Amino acid sequence: MINLEKGFVYSMKEYTAMKKLFLLMSLGLFISCSSVQNPDYERNLEITKEWFETFGDEDLDNTMSYFADEIEYQSAFYGGPLMNKAETREYYQGWHDAMENINYEPQNFLPGVDPDTGLLNGSVRTYGSWSGTMTSSGKSFEGLWYHYLTFDENGKIINGGDFGDATGLIMSVKPDEE
């Protein structure tokens, strides 16, 4: 007999069975908590790749068609705000007006996680480099960037942002002062 707690006495057979049951329950809990790839990630990844191509085509209406009506988008400029859809459109219009031959070359695409739970949520992260030419100066640029895009159930972007040195990039390709 094994006395595990005051008042509870178990036979070796009962104790072994309880140990096995506890281990099986622990394994079940572990498996149920394991994160499985979000089934929407592959769809969202394809949408993300299309979106980057569309942005490079400088078709602003098509670029914005990938966004839901209610979005939050983070600007890459120093002190840049969290923007709604209208502000995001102006942000992209500024890039399209200032640059030409815009191209994004991804180094990788990664599944994103919910910041509150740490669980995969179908969002897409990417590291890569943007290149192009500043329209007003004719100077070329290339810079490393990080982007994140979160999607709703309809495949529309509801949250996203850019991380890169946007201010430095603009300063490096501005027209020379005379």
Q: Where are each of the predicted segments found?
A:
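Exposed beta-sheet edge and beta->alpha loop/turn motif
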Residues: 125-156
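A short gly/proline-enriched turn/hairpin at secondary-structure junctions
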Residues: 72-83, 98-99
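Surface-exposed, charged secondary-structure patches
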Residues: 91-137
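Structured segments of extracytoplasmic/periplasmic soluble domains
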Residues: 51-54, 58, 66, 70, ...
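Short, low-complexity N-terminal intrinsically disordered segments enriched in polar/charged residues
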Residues: 33-61, 65
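Hydrophobic pocket/interface hotspot
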Residues: 51, 62-64, 71, 88, ...
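Low-complexity, intrinsically disordered terminal/linker segments enriched in charged
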Residues: 158-178
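Bacterial Sec-dependent N-terminal signal peptides
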Residues: 1-43
